[in-house]
Amino acid sequence: MMDMVGYGQNGYYVQGGVNEDGSSSPERIAAVDANVENLAKFREYANSKGVAAGLWTESNLVPDSDNQTYWHLLRDFRKEVSVGGATTLKTDVAWVGPGYSFQLNGVKTAYDIITTAEQFRPNIISLDGWAGSQRFNSVWSGDQTGGNWEYIRFHIPTYIGSSLSGNPNIGSDMDGIFGGKALIAARDYQWKSFTPQMLNMDGWGTYMKAPYTFGDPYTGINRMYMKIKSQLMPYIYTTAVSASNMDTGNDDTGLPIVRAMFLEYPEDAYAYSRTMQYQFCLEQYFSCTSL
């Protein structure tokens, strides 16, 4: 289980502290360090409850040189990883930034810090995605209203389309971020158990976004499918390696995790019209997921 948090409690609405060369004053850095210590304490508490802590950011990954930036918004991702213990990063709206290069440089920096400096397995989620993004981050489709069948209907071809576009690392909110309904949420857990990534985005919906919100029978259904997802993880990891264009010996190098039917059955004309059906993972182990 992963909890995405913000943690800036020091330096509220304090500005300045930027030297002529663009570096930060000791006081400015001290505010960042104090916030990282708060993160470390939260991470320790979360870990004791079986929850890993990640970070949701709309900021640069290092303290910027803008005198107008409030200190509580400053970041030092290297310290957040090495001291705070964060290994997951979700980049949000401000990461559209100047455009293409801003997002790619940001997620690559995060990837390098987590993997090279700290030697952890990274989990980087971004709402931005262009050619090259698939090397470092998954792409999240979210901020929609759940509680209706249309939410499921348009996400199935979205996943297929993203996979065909070269980014197999796709996920979205469970039953949306707004609204919510027990039956729709259960169906969303069912089909998304056969997708690369699942996210609960809580705090804006009519109901809490969690697999146990509505009680049984929905909790039992969600639990069963999440257990299936856990059992499938070795296959999903293997297929993810294949999707990154590496040979796993399964004769599927370069194929995505969510596969349009015509990728598996190119000689079948009918397969080209199946916009609501896809092949998941390894053909020899799994039949088609038909939705």
Where do the language-model regions lie?
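Catalytic-domain carbohydrate-binding cleft regions of carbohydrate-active enzymes
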Residues: 1-291
